[in-house]
Amino acid sequence: MLKVIQLDKTYGSNKHSLKAVNFTAKPGEVTAIIGPSGAGKTTILRSINQLIRDDSGQILLDDTDIRQANKAELRKVRHHIGMIFQNYNLISPLTALENVLHGRLGAKSTVAGMLGLYSSAEKQEALQLLDEVGLKEYAYQRCDQLSGGQQQRVGIARALMQHPKMILCDEPIASLDPKSTTIVMDILRRLAKEKQLIILINLHQVDIAMAYTDHIVGINSGAIVFEGATNEVDDAVLQHIYRQPDQSTAVAANEN
């Protein structure tokens, strides 16, 4: 389980990006973070894997406080946290298979990683993961020859190659057409259930969050204003999450 406790982040002249953020995300569930642009959604994800350093709080993955990890410990923790990006973050001239294999780099020595030394078992696993996302037939095709939706599925397979406990998805469908969006979200939901993964996803599309996720975290101006099961979200909750800063803040964040 992921537990974020009293997470605070300040930029510049005491401008709060995150204000005492608290929420949980469970294995086997897709948890969506929703809220207005600039509310702090991406900052939360980047704080979880410490791509940016927050100011205070706790980030517990199982019993490990990621914030307290030293450099060597953080490298090990990150190996169990997959990341899926809006812009795919693939090495375009390489094949789909080669990109998926890069998911094992965190488990290899620097020399083995630089030389691209992968075992036959790792190559078979990468092929199996491409099959799981419906791309086995494209294994030896360059990624810059794939569609955006196909590239995002390669990114999912690469994240799975890390043997993760959790996958962080930063606006993974923002650049996709409706058909590709459906395919990607179906895959993420299936993987959460089958592999008992924590899937934490930032979304601007409320309809997609309502259709594909189990748990909703609503953020506004850096503060969590709602947390609960997706089926608890109604129009009043959405209006509260997406309210303008000067509007009433009468609804308290759900503790579930």
From Swiss-Prot:
Reactions catalysed, as given in the entry: phosphonate(out) + ATP + H2O = phosphonate(in) + ADP + phosphate + H(+)
- Supply the InterPro entries for this chain: AAA+_ATPase, ABC_transporter-like_ATP-bd, ABC_transporter-like_CS, ABC_transpr_PhnC, MetN_ABC_transporter-like, P-loop_NTPase
Q: Does the keyword Nucleotide-binding apply?
A: yes
Paired cysteines (S-S): none
**Top-level lineage group:** Bacteria
Residue ranges annotated for the ABC transporter domain, each copy included: 2-246
Residues noted as binding ATP in the record, renumbered to the chain: G35, P36, S37, G38, A39, G40, K41, T42
Entry keywords, A to Z: ATP-binding, Cell membrane, Membrane, Nucleotide-binding, Phosphonate transport, Translocase, Transport
Q: What is its EC number?
A: 7.3.2.2
Q: Where in the cell is it found?
A: Cell membrane
Q: Does the keyword Lipoprotein apply?
A: no
Which residues constitute the signal peptide according to the record? Answer: none
Subunit structure, interactors included = The complex is composed of two ATP-binding proteins (PhnC), two transmembrane proteins (PhnE) and a solute-binding protein (PhnD).
PANTHER family documented for this protein = AMINO ACID IMPORT ATP-BINDING PROTEIN, PHOSPHONATES IMPORT ATP-BINDING PROTEIN PHNC
> Would you identify the family this protein belongs to, as annotated?
Belongs to the ABC transporter superfamily. Phosphonates importer (TC 3.A.1.9.1) family.
What job does the chain carry out? Answer: Part of the ABC transporter complex PhnCDE involved in phosphonates import. Responsible for energy coupling to the transport system.
Q: Write the protein's name.
A: Phosphonates import ATP-binding protein PhnC
